[in-house]
Structure formats: structure tokens, C-alpha cells
């Protein structure tokens, strides 16, 4: 196996810029910023979305695609909504 072909894997702190949530994880991501976390200094990587702010994990998910494939098919062929008839 060749040496020095893989990036360095080390602990990195990720900061969710939306919520301010910080978590420590192993990564090869590099950063010039550092942060003090749990008494140690780690590289800091800023992220816009994490499990703390993503709608799927927070339960605040919105369905933006109201006109799906089935709705378009029904509209195209003039079919009534089966649920509305009940």
C-alpha cells in the first residue's frame, strides 16, 4: 500500500449556522478556523444544514410539491379525485 495518498482523518467540530448547534465528528475536511470544544481545540467547519435544523429530522417538514404526478394525470384526463367523492 502506498503511503501519503490519503487525506488526514481527524476530529472536526461542525457548526450549524442556522441554529448554532455544534457537534464533534471525524472528517477529512480542512479549515483554517479553530474552536475550543469540550476543553480541546479543533478545526471548525460551518454548515448551513445539519440534523438539528433539517426539516426531516426536526418534524417541521413542509410538502411543497402539491401538484404531483397522480394529480397531473387526473387533471389531464379529467378524472375526479376519488377521496373527494367519499
Swiss-Prot record:
Any one GO CC term of the record: ribonucleoprotein complex
InterPro entries per UniProt: Ribosomal_bL28/bL31-like_sf (IPR034704), Ribosomal_bL31 (IPR002150), Ribosomal_bL31_B (IPR027493), Ribosomal_bL31_sf (IPR042105)
Assigned keywords, A-Z: Ribonucleoprotein, Ribosomal protein
GO BP: translation
Molecular-function GO terms, alphabetical: structural constituent of ribosome
Similarity comment text for this entry: Belongs to the bacterial ribosomal protein bL31 family. Type B subfamily.
Oligomer status and interactors: Part of the 50S ribosomal subunit.
Protein name: Large ribosomal subunit protein bL31B
The species this protein was found in: Streptococcus equi subsp. zooepidemicus (strain MGCS10565)
Native organism taxonomy: Bacteria, Bacillati, Bacillota, Bacilli, Lactobacillales
Gene name as annotated: rpmE2
